[in-house]
């Protein structure tokens, strides 16, 4: 299924709750208040009770991106996706392998769950791909997987904003392009290698931006989020 691409920046900013405990996640959400409506929950928080926390966010009318990067045999993927669809979360990731994506799309049919195919992690560059046994460079592999996700009927993909413009040209206007590795000007890259500022990512064609450390690690989290939202609104719909 496709997902609505929000014109309002608050629906396009996804804050990554990359924290070790539910208590810390609750503190982040409380501090951000009404400024942020969309949160990403990944492995770190899932293994600390994050699935129940995801349900509580949904009950509080927040949107949840469950970043599980699933990859397994078709039947296992399908059964897992069926249960995730019942949780009421908005987005779920799986690795962009054709058979897995097709199984997931069929399992999510009739629900509001937007399935996202993960192309190449933003922490990886061409040298990392060669070490892992891939012969394609990052952009070639990203575009190949983006096209496969589109053909499978996925709602969107996860990819670096560096490749967003080429992806948008390849898959058209309807798929979500969700971009991690977003760093405001002057921020440190951390362990990310293919990064971009919020404004540049939107200009390149990204539909949603994932921001974690620049907000969660800021002394004033709400001020950091509002600054990014202001930058996003200055660009408008890409």
Swiss-Prot record:
Protein name according to UniProt: Orotidine 5'-phosphate decarboxylase
One BP annotation, GO: 'de novo' pyrimidine nucleobase biosynthetic process
Annotated catalysed reactions: orotidine 5'-phosphate + H(+) = UMP + CO2
Keyword Signal: no
EC number: 4.1.1.23
Function text: Catalyzes the decarboxylation of orotidine 5'-monophosphate (OMP) to uridine 5'-monophosphate (UMP).
Encoding gene per record: pyrF
Organism: Brucella melitensis biotype 2 (strain ATCC 23457)
Taxonomy, superkingdom: Bacteria
Pfam families assigned to the protein according to its UniProt record, in alphabetical order: OMPdecase
Sites where the protein binds substrate: 18, 40, 67-76, 122, 183, 192, 213
Subunit structure: Homodimer.
Keywords: Decarboxylase, Lyase, Pyrimidine biosynthesis
One GO MF term: orotidine-5'-phosphate decarboxylase activity
PANTHER family named in the record: OROTIDINE 5'-PHOSPHATE DECARBOXYLASE
GO cellular component terms, A-Z: cytosol
Membership in a protein family: Belongs to the OMP decarboxylase family. Type 1 subfamily.
Biochemical pathway: Pyrimidine metabolism; UMP biosynthesis via de novo pathway; UMP from orotate: step 2/2
Record keyword rRNA-binding present: no
Database matches in InterPro entries: Aldolase_TIM, OMPdecase, OMPdecase_AS, OMPdecase_bac, OMPdeCOase_dom, RibuloseP-bd_barrel
Positions annotated as active site in the UniProt record: 69
């Amino acid at each position: 299924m496709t997902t609505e691409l929000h014109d309002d920046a608050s629906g396009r900013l996804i804050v990554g709750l990359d924290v070790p405990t539910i208590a810390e996640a609750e503190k982040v959400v409380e501090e951000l208040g009404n400024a942020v409506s969309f949160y990403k929950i990944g492995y770190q928080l899932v293994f600390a009770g994050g699935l129940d926390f995801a349900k509580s966010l949904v009950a509080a009318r927040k949107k949840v991106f469950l970043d599980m990067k699933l990859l397994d045999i078709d039947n296992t993927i399908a059964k897992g996706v069926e249960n995730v669809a019942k949780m009421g979360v908005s987005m779920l990731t799986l690795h962009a392998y054709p058979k897995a994506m097709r199984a997931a799309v069929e399992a999510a049919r009739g629900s509001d769950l937007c399935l996202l195919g993960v192309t190449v992690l933003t922490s990886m560059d061409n040298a990392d791909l060669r070490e892992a046994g891939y012969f394609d460079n990052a952009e070639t592999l990203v575009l190949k997987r983006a096209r496969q996700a589109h053909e499978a009927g996925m709602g969107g993909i996860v990819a670096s904003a560096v490749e967003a413009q080429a992806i948008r040209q390849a898959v058209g206007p309807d798929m979500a392009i969700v971009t991690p590795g977003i760093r405001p000007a002057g921020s440190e890259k951390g362990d990310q290698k293919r990064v971009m500022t919020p404004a540049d990512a939107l200009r390149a064609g990204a539909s949603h931006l994932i921001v974690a450390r620049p907000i969660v690690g800021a002394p004033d989290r709400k001020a950091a989020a509002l600054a990014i939202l202001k930058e996003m609104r200055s660009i408008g719909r890409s």
